[in-house]
Amino acid sequence: MSIDLVFVAPDDPLADGMVDAMQEAGIRAFGPNANAAIIEASKVFSKNLMKKYGIPTAKYEVFNDAQKAIDYIKNENTAPVVVKADGLALGKGVIIAQSVDEAIEAVKEIMEDKKFGDSGNNIVIEEFLTGPEVSVLAFTDGKCVKPMVSSKRPQACF
């Protein structure tokens, strides 16, 4: 018995290059390679990509220094605000802070206490947007794009 095709879905193996490794070993694999998976694996990369190509996204700032992030929060004095660990954090790396104090605490937890390990070396602080969150995904081979059915994440996840 041999392996015909491997579907790689979890974020960590995709970001770590599992599809690349399978293909190098001659095993057909379905999923993005590591270069494409960075869109999901790095909030900083994805936000900067959206900005570069004019894709609408929430106003944001990126920080690699906790004190600079805290100073920004104090100067902006806006809540609620969203604090995101840059890297993968098993779906737990997004904190919706309802107050300035909560936002400062989120920065400390992520960057100083290393709540999400190295995934919190950089953070994104972005404006809080209201409304439904919808995911739109598509299959592509680099030439042709086939959209999937859109989905809506229940707000209770946050």
Residue ranges and their predicted role:
Residues 1, 76:
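Active-site charged/polar residues at nucleotide-handling catalytic sites that mediate phosphoryl
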Residues 4-42, 54-64:
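A short, GP-enriched loop/loop-strand-helix hinge that lies immediately N-terminal to
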Residues 56-59, 78-82, 97-135, 139, ...:
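Conserved ATP-binding module of the ATP-grasp superfamily
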Residues 145-158:
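ATP-dependent carboxylate/phosphate-activation module, predominantly the ATP-grasp catalytic core
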Residues 14-16, 69, 133-134:
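Short, well-ordered alpha-helical microsegments
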